[in-house]
Amino acid sequence: MPSFDIVSKVDMQEVDNAVNQAVKEIGQRYDFKGSKSEVTLEKDAIKILADDDFRLKAIVDILQSKFIKRGISPKALQYGKAETASGGMVRQIITVQQGISKEKGKEVVAVIKDTKLKVQGQIQDDQVRVTGKNRDDLQEAIRTLKGKDLGIELQFVNFRD
């Protein structure tokens, strides 16, 4: 029975490269001269520490542009609230989304069911497996999901006949 998996994964090496490029650009930019701004990557989170809101927004813009250049979707990033830190600094934590949460998995399965195709979706940990008897139905399900904006980046892997 043909099947495929729907996953939402981010290459952490690319995230590391994008953060390093952003740090390098921040160090070279004129508007950050004398600033104590810093960007650090910790496991699945990016910590941004900036002097003020203006610089924080500038750092986030730099990070987003670097992510896009490295082929990482902005949908894979979950932005935390900007909060004040010690010394008048501003801190923000950006979480890198790995996997499909249960709620998003339910949304994906609901979209698949709404298509009225003869396919079934099953939530398995952080991925969704879609099975069906007809390969064309599976491809139609992929097309439908690509057309929907579910708020996360989806990859379709492990297509088996």
From Swiss-Prot:
Q: Which GO terms describe its molecular function?
A: nucleotide binding
Q: Which Gene3D superfamilies match?
A: 3.30.70.860, YajQ-like, domain 2
The record's annotation in CDD domains points to: YajQ_like (cd11740)
Q: Which UniProt keywords apply?
A: Nucleotide-binding
InterPro entries with a match to the protein in the record: DUF520, UPF0234-like_C, UPF0234_N, YajQ-like_sf
Q: Which cellular component terms (GO) are annotated to the entry? A: cytosol
Q: What's the stated role of this polypeptide?
A: Nucleotide-binding protein.
In which family does this protein belong, per the annotation?
A: Belongs to the YajQ family.
What is the name of the protein in this document? Nucleotide-binding protein Gmet_3206
What organism does the record attribute this protein to? Answer: Geobacter metallireducens (strain ATCC 53774 / DSM 7210 / GS-15)
Q: What is the lineage of its organism?
A: Bacteria, Pseudomonadati, Thermodesulfobacteriota, Desulfuromonadia, Geobacterales
